[in-house]
């Protein structure tokens, strides 16, 4: 029985709403047939390479390197294509050129004695690599990925073969003319970037772009311009989304984490958050307090700090931590249904005796200097703290780059994603065993 024999007047009427909708894009039988042929053909192409990254935590240099080499996929392609026809050192040189074309070209030009000959060999090698990585895509998809400046030339090189006698001279002249017109450097850079792009068909960021690293904003700059990606939000990403949405407890938390790891670059340089009011407040409030236990973890710091700067960051860390406790407690009081009463910590402190009381047990405090905490009303912000948090709020709400990056997170992100029969989500999901089933 054919598919056509299943079509009845009743089924047409039942599907009329969908047929009318489809007719907007495919008004004729020919248009619909062409699209069906195209989609059926695409389904029989090899699946594009999916790249999964998680827990980046602001480490932008590692992130960018992994994107450039596609976690070793480029190296594998080069080995498959050239095998034993190139020495290992030559394959490594070619891979490095693909990863970092601008930098590698400068090194090559400083040492190569016959640069035109090197251009000729390298361009032919790059064409072979590009033909390989583009082979799993339709010509239409490859064409849309090409740089406009060299689109026509690259299409000719990708889809014509030097083995064909009638095209051998044609291809060779294209390459030699690229060299003679002094466009080889730009063309090589364009080809290397294209190889990087085609090697990764889709990028999955499975949580935590933000946290302790110094360059989360640089990572977000890269993602905002990336060709195909999705994000499954991690706890640190959601924290920044909350801060950018105006939640002051989240603002205090992201600042505290930055102080803890000595990374101020994302806040100050990336998003223009003014930390001067916090520094002034911390120096005044904790002038004689060493704040020892709030010293930053300098092995994660974005730069080397002198002793004076480290002391200031330590004071700022303590100041914003106390403010965070107060702001979070106010939310918990306002929303008891959250069931987070156990997170209200300041009320569990016996300030006179310097102990923390939890479930009937007492724990001595390692720090007992809390000049901004009123034991009778521990979660009330002082006037100075209230003024400070208003200034911090203003900085967060008026950062244009932060708004851009958070729009990207909201647009391309979600709590989870089902893709190619994979369930993607950050961290873990609690399971309950019911009989023989996990739910």
Model features per residue range: what roles?
Residues 2-439:
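Feature recognizes metal-dependent phosphohydrolase scaffolds
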